[in-house]
UniProtKB/Swiss-Prot annotation:
Region spans: Disordered: 99-122
One GO cellular component term noted in the UniProt record for this chain: cytosol
Similarity field: Belongs to the universal ribosomal protein uS13 family.
Described function: Located at the top of the head of the 30S subunit, it contacts several helices of the 16S rRNA. In the 70S ribosome it contacts the 23S rRNA (bridge B1a) and protein L5 of the 50S subunit (bridge B1b), connecting the 2 subunits; these bridges are implicated in subunit movement. Contacts the tRNAs in the A and P-sites.
GO molecular function, one term: rRNA binding
Source organism (scientific name): Bradyrhizobium diazoefficiens (strain JCM 10833 / BCRC 13528 / IAM 13628 / NBRC 14792 / USDA 110)
Oligomer and partners: Part of the 30S ribosomal subunit. Forms a loose heterodimer with protein S19. Forms two bridges to the 50S subunit in the 70S ribosome.
Keywords for the protein's UniProt record, in alphabetical order: Ribonucleoprotein, Ribosomal protein, RNA-binding, rRNA-binding, tRNA-binding
NCBIfam families, per the entry: uS13_bact
Single GO biological process annotation from the record: translation
PANTHER family registered for this protein in UniProt: 30S RIBOSOMAL PROTEIN S13/40S RIBOSOMAL PROTEIN S18, SMALL RIBOSOMAL SUBUNIT PROTEIN US13M
Name of the protein: Small ribosomal subunit protein uS13
InterPro entries referenced in this protein's UniProt entry, alphabetically: Rbsml_uS13_C, Ribosomal_uS13, Ribosomal_uS13-like_H2TH, Ribosomal_uS13_bac-type, Ribosomal_uS13_CS
C-alpha cells in the first residue's frame, strides 16, 4: 500500500481513482498529476515502481495544496470572513446557509435538528 500525502492509497485500484482518496485531489487534478509524471491513466497502484510513487509524491508536494494544509487554508479563509463582518462571515457565524439558499423551509443540514415549539402540534 503506497502512502502519498499522509494517506494510504489502495493498491488494487487504478492510479487515477486511488489519488482521489487524498483530500483536495479530484478527477481533474489526478489526471494532471499523472500527465506531469507521464504515467498511463489505466495503470494500477500495485504496478507502480517506488520511483514513480516518489515522483507523484514530489509533484503533489510541490504544486498542490492537499489534506491538512488545504483544510487549514479553508478554515483560515472562513475565519477571515467572520472577522471582517461581511455578509458571508455573518452567515458562517450564525450557522446558516452562506450561498443564498432559502431558510424558511429546508436548510436543516446547516441549521441542525429542528427545535420543538410549544403550541405547534397538529
Amino acid at each position: 500500500m503506497a502512502r502519498i500525502a499522509g494517506v494510504n492509497i489502495p493498491t488494487n485500484k487504478r492510479v487515477l481513482i486511488a489519488l482521489q482518496y487524498i483530500h483536495g485531489i479530484g478527477q481533474k487534478i489526478a489526471g494532471e498529476i499523472l500527465e506531469k509524471v507521464k504515467i498511463p491513466v489505466d495503470r494500477r497502484v500495485s504496478q507502480l515502481s517506488d520511483a514513480e510513487v516518489l515522483q507523484i509524491r514530489e509533484v503533489i508536494d510541490r504544486d498542490y495544496l492537499v489534506e491538512g494544509d488545504l483544510r487549514r487554508e479553508v478554515g483560515i479563509n472562513i475565519k477571515r470572513l467572520m472577522d471582517l463582518g461581511c455578509y458571508r462571515g455573518l452567515r458562517h457565524r450564525r450557522g446558516l446557509p452562506v450561498r443564498g439558499q432559502r431558510t424558511h423551509t429546508n436548510a436543516r443540514t446547516r441549521k441542525g435538528p429542528a427545535k420543538a415549539i410549544a403550541g405547534k402540534k397538529k
